[in-house]
From Swiss-Prot:
Record field: catalytic activity: alpha-D-glucosamine 1-phosphate + acetyl-CoA = N-acetyl-alpha-D-glucosamine 1-phosphate + CoA + H(+); N-acetyl-alpha-D-glucosamine 1-phosphate + UTP + H(+) = UDP-N-acetyl-alpha-D-glucosamine + diphosphate
SUPFAM superfamilies in the record: Nucleotide-diphospho-sugar transferases, Trimeric LpxA-like enzymes
InterPro entries, per database record: Bifunctional_GlmU, GlmU-like, GlmU_C_LbH, Hexapep, MobA-like_NTP_Trfase, Nucleotide-diphossugar_trans, Trimer_LpxA-like_sf
Binding site for UDP-N-acetyl-alpha-D-glucosamine: 12-15, 26, 83, 88-89, 151, 166, 181, 239, 344, 362, 377, 388
Quaternary state and interactors: Homotrimer.
Gene transcribed to yield this protein: glmU
Name by which UniProt lists this protein: Bifunctional protein GlmU
Cofactor: how bound: Binds 1 Mg(2+) ion per subunit.
Entry's Gene Ontology cellular component terms: cytoplasm; membrane
Biological or metabolic pathway of the protein: Nucleotide-sugar biosynthesis; UDP-N-acetyl-alpha-D-glucosamine biosynthesis; N-acetyl-alpha-D-glucosamine 1-phosphate from alpha-D-glucosamine 6-phosphate (route II): step 2/2; Nucleotide-sugar biosynthesis; UDP-N-acetyl-alpha-D-glucosamine biosynthesis; UDP-N-acetyl-alpha-D-glucosamine from N-acetyl-alpha-D-glucosamine 1-phosphate: step 1/1; Bacterial outer membrane biogenesis; LPS lipid A biosynthesis
Region (Linker): 242-262
GO terms for biological process, alphabetical: cell morphogenesis; cell wall organization; lipid A biosynthetic process; peptidoglycan biosynthetic process; regulation of cell shape; UDP-N-acetylglucosamine biosynthetic process
GO molecular function, one term: magnesium ion binding
Function: Catalyzes the last two sequential reactions in the de novo biosynthetic pathway for UDP-N-acetylglucosamine (UDP-GlcNAc). The C-terminal domain catalyzes the transfer of acetyl group from acetyl coenzyme A to glucosamine-1-phosphate (GlcN-1-P) to produce N-acetylglucosamine-1-phosphate (GlcNAc-1-P), which is converted into UDP-GlcNAc by the transfer of uridine 5-monophosphate (from uridine 5-triphosphate), a reaction catalyzed by the N-terminal domain.
């Protein structure tokens, strides 16, 4: 989506956000996997404007490096400018204009960094309206059932935009108006610069209000237009954590619906949370209580959930992931994971593999067709194809100072309760006996067993634990075993 080259966007993100009651700058609070500022800049970047400027103030030293990272990921330049003192939105825009070339003469779009649902399509409509009407300014408006806190749109009898009055400066009758300023504008730069130079701080907040530019341009005889949108959530701002949660839920509803329309079955949208950068293939079923976060990628025809959280996890086609918590891992096609499986970063499960109940994996590669069915820890290991790791096995990877790797070949069968003390190698086709502690390499095809013959110490419980329920049970059992059974053929 592109427009004529002479379009610049200024994003206002200098506010302190005191109502958030947070040590985190307001625009860095997240929803659907992105900060509010990131949502805004992603939308602005889709317009491909000639210039993109972010105005920072409060906590600029924390926000500016993140803007630079985002600019790199978006593959475009984003200029940052600083508002030294909080003198109002009018002053913030003036700071933003200072980052533009002196000879810039095109359209300036002004928006805020705390409207995370604002999309590129809405901005495109605003710019098209602005260009079609040859206006000095076009303001985006919407109608709210409860407009408290928003600037009201004042219109003339012929319905032209006359001015914008802030909540704190509005009369009782003006506060009854439900059409509000969405805080998004398209300006001709020369008209904007002229009006900014005449702003006054003679108001309740003693600040330079950007909306006052509307009345100034109107008095100058300039054309002032408005673009009304019915979907007010697109321009809803965030000032506190209640609004953050409300917009987060609304954004999630839209994300889930988009996946449903693309061929994904979501059994219970109310308990399903999907980040904006998640991709899900067709005919996949998402069960209740599932969170798909970060850059998680799900293939076609998968079954995910219930009660599953995946963060930056790749899942191949036809895989099943049930009651699993996983991050920074890869699950192969037709693999089965869960229930109650913990995938820590660096886990790679091959095609058709299985990680079952109460299995934890970390920094390990598990080959195609290999099964780790239950009650096992696999850390810092490389396991070949079509092997089976018995229940209760542990990869002992830490020696108190360093993590060591274990390598298990293909077609290996390990008995229940095997301990692989790394570093160690087990060759292809080898077997291990139940309870074996593997401290040395096992050759291909060998059976590894450890420990001496079992030794039973008779009557130990009665001697060492006399009077206990165990001792009494043992006494009775011994007595029963020592009593000969009656002779069935004996006659009285």
């Amino acid at each position: 989506m592109t427009f004529r080259g002479d379009t610049a966007v200024v994003v206002l993100a200098a506010g302190a956000g005191t109502r958030m009651r947070s040590d985190i700058p307001k625009v860095l609070h997240t929803l659907a996997g992105r900060s509010m500022l990131s949502h805004s800049l992603h939308a602005m970047a889709k317009l491909a404007p000639q210039h993109l400027v972010v105005v920072l103030g409060h906590c600029h030293e924390r926000i500016s490096p993140l803007v630079d990272e985002l600019a790199e990921s978006l593959g475009r330049t984003i200029n940052v400018t600083l508002q030294d003192r909080p003198l109002g939105t009018g002053d913030a825009v003036r700071c933003g204009l200072s980052a533009l070339p002196a000879d810039y003469s095109g359209i300036v779009v002004v928006t805020a960094g705390d409207t995370p649902l604002l999309d590129a399509e809405t901005l495109a409509d605003l710019i098209e309206t602005h260009s079609a009407t040859s206006s000095a300014v076009t303001v985006l408006t919407t109608t709210l059932s409860d407009p408290h806190g928003y600037g009201r749109i004042l219109r003339t009898q012929d319905n032209a935009v006359m001015a914008i009055v802030e909540q704190t400066d509005a009369t009782p009758s003006q506060r009854e108006i439900r059409e509000v300023n969405a805080g998004v504008y398209a300006f001709e730069i020369t008209a904007l610069q002229s009006a900014l130079s005449r702003l006054s701080s003679d108001n309740a907040q003693q600040e330079l209000y950007l909306p006052d530019v509307i009345a100034i341009l109107r008095r100058d005889g300039q054309t002032v237009s408005a673009r009304h949108i019915d979907d007010s959530a697109l321009v809803a701002g965030v000032n506190d954590r209640v609004q953050l949660a409300q917009l987060g839920a609304e954004l999630n509803r839209r994300i889930v619906a988009a996946h449903q329309m693309a061929g994904v079955t979501v059994i219970d949208p109310a308990t399903t949370w999907i980040d904006v950068d998640v991709a899900i293939g067709r005919d996949t079923v998402i069960q209740p209580g599932t969170q798909l976060l970060g850059h998680t990628q799900i293939g076609d025809r998968c079954e995910i959930g219930p009660d599953t959280t995946l963060t930056d996890v790749t899942v191949g086609d036809n895989a099943s992931v049930v009651r699993t918590h996983g991050s920074s891992s890869s699950i192969g096609a037709a693999a089965a994971v869960g229930p109650f499986t913990f995938l820590r970063p660096g886990t790679v499960l091959g095609t058709g593999g299985k990680l079952g109940a109460f299995v934890e994996t970390k920094n390990s590669t598990i080959g195609a067709g290999t099964k780790v069915p239950h009650l096992t820890y696999v850390g810092d290991a490389d396991i070949g194809d079509d092997s089976n790791i018995g229940a209760g096995s542990v990869f002992v990877n830490y020696d108190g100072m360093t993590k060591n790797r274990a390598t298990i070949g293909s077609h290996v069968r390990s008995g229940a309760g095997t301990r692989f003390v790394a570093p160690v190698n087990v060759g292809d086709g080898a077997y291990t006996g139940a309870g074996t502690v593997i401290r040395d390499d096992v050759p291909p095809g060998a059976l590894a067993v450890s420990g001496g013959p079992q030794r039973n110490i008779e009557d130990w419980v009665q001697q060492k634990r006399p009077g206990t329920p165990s001792a009494e049970a043992a006494r009775k059992a011994s007595a029963e075993q020592s009593t000969p059974p009656p002779d069935a053929d004996q006659t009285p």
